[in-house]
From Swiss-Prot:
This is tRNA 5-methylaminomethyl-2-thiouridine biosynthesis bifunctional protein MnmC. Its main location: cytoplasm. GO terms for biological process: methylation; tRNA wobble base modification. The gene is mnmC. It is found in: Cytoplasm. Keywords: Cytoplasm, FAD, Flavoprotein, Methyltransferase, Multifunctional enzyme, Oxidoreductase, S-adenosyl-L-methionine, Transferase, tRNA processing. It catalyses: 5-aminomethyl-2-thiouridine(34) in tRNA + S-adenosyl-L-methionine = 5-methylaminomethyl-2-thiouridine(34) in tRNA + S-adenosyl-L-homocysteine + H(+). Catalyzes the last two steps in the biosynthesis of 5-methylaminomethyl-2-thiouridine (mnm(5)s(2)U) at the wobble position (U34) in tRNA. Catalyzes the FAD-dependent demodification of cmnm(5)s(2)U34 to nm(5)s(2)U34, followed by the transfer of a methyl group from S-adenosyl-L-methionine to nm(5)s(2)U34, to form mnm(5)s(2)U34. Its EC number is 2.1.1.61, 1.5.-.-.
Amino acid sequence: MPRGLILATPQLPPDGTPFSARYDDVYHSTEGGLAQAHHVFLGGNGLPGGWQGKRSFTIVETGFGQGLNFLATWAAWRDDPQRCGRLDFVSVEKHPFDRAGLALVHAQEGALASLAEALRQAWPVPVPGVHRLVFDAGRVTLTLMLGDAETLLPQLSCAADAFYLDGFSPAKNPDLWQPGVFKQLARIARGGATLATYTAAGAVRHGLREAGFEVRKAPGFGRKRDMTVAAFPTHWRTRRGPAEAPVWPERHAIVLGAGLAGCSVAERLAARGWRITLIDEHEAPAGGASAHRAAAMHPHVSIDDSVLSRLSRAGNLLARRHWEALDRAGFATGFHPTGVLQLAEHADDAAEQQRIVQALGFPADFIAWLDAARAADRVGAGVPQGGWWFAQAGWVAPPDICRAALAAAGEAVELRWRTRIESLLRHDAGWRACDAQGNVIAHAPVVVLANSLDAVRLAPLASAALKPVRGQLTDVPVAALEDGVPWPRAVVCGDGYLLPRERGAPTVRVGSSFQPGETDPDARTADHAANLRRLAGLQPAHAAALARVDPARLLGYVGVRCVSANRLPLIGAVADEAAIMAPGFRLRGPHAALPRVPGLYAALAYGSRGLTWSVLGAELLAAQIDGGPLPLESELAAALDPGRFLMRALRHGKHAA
């Protein structure tokens, strides 16, 4: 059965009120959507007064619709001189509009036109999962959860201050008003959290009371006599309370490593008002595995929509949105949205690719299958097979991403180049990063390890079994290619990959070898020869010319990447391996948590997907460190947990004494 979303179809009756034929209901009151948003949702939750004087404020909504409640709340936040420092808005939507549909239903909202335009500009490709949108330089976030609320709300990790319940009426859309939904809202509610909804249906009020809310009626909007408001009492406790952020004596972090991982973490924390000390052994950013001139990025796809597929989809789409935002802000990333063609290996593989596309049911602007003729037309050069076309994918020089991130972070980041940290020492409520002589280079409550394999000597990471993987890319002279045969204008991958030719560049780039356990930094003739064979397979029209190339005369790039035992990155708080391995340690209870090393976090093992994980990992860490909704489903965040290998072993009794 297709896993893709069924999109909303915009309909505007003569009175201009957006209407859903699927639910036979309007998206907001016929007496004015903006006025309803102010009366029911802002007024019903005591806003803007409720957020005043707070560092952050989190609102969770059921039923995003056209986004009018979000836009009204964002506008009210902007207009409030006493506003909170950061507004986090989470909304669940089963049937989202696409960008064109939003434009149609937004046409009536002139008062919010500029904010609506910003929302549409950031609007994600409508595929299932969690999508983080960032506005106002990081001070406003919108976390869209696209899919069924009963499935997604249990995966939401946050601490909510207010709730907007705005699905279609309980009579028309009963699934969104079930006891299970209300229990999930109670799970993430802070003590004192407020709730408002336009409906006064008895079943809704009863369900909210059963979940622990204190419920009452209030004057409704327009022709509705009553609406419902509620509060979550401070004395009520659910079995698992909301996910609260740690409390730090100061908002200062040391980040070790200035590659894609470290620079992205620095930028995301800086956007939240943190001060960063960024330390690296090289003399400039991207001095390690992030140093290569160009790299491609595209998602992983599988018939079962695996954890890797879901994570890589989230990472690719978030990175693309974020880099576009940096570009608009004047921090040039150099990302080339050329698209990526992933070739089928043979006819049977082509049939399987088509089956997967049909089964997933995702939009064509995320993934499409093209036969060889259409694929050749799309990339501007002949290809031996058809394949998957990823329209949102492309390529970029990782050092450019690093420089853009640091430029965006600005003075919040103190740069310490050519500096090697020999030890990390706990001191009082923080960490000291020391050199070989014991001198304290920096001290802060938080340390983020983004220094690849070097992290192993500084932190308890034995359970992750981090290993090196050597990769070699080859620069092929343009003069060595078949004369008059076009070169692809998009990334083409299969057995290896090739990148489009940069304007005026004398070479084109092809890769890559994959050699687990190897760290040799010197280029090898045999690997250049293997890359030439890969290129001949991707571009058979150049095969004869490539056969005449002497691989011993070629140049290229060698990088050593870091991978974990299951090839997924390590992103999150570092587990306290010493405490866990102590005799008698047990996990107790179904929701038992691993002990963590206070203030120590990892952004490691990005492997060959550094571009994919960089922004997602940084946004996830920033939320874990500083608070706010996670940008991923909880189960996906757990799949990246640095302590996941220990957790798995403990559950299987392997470390029980």
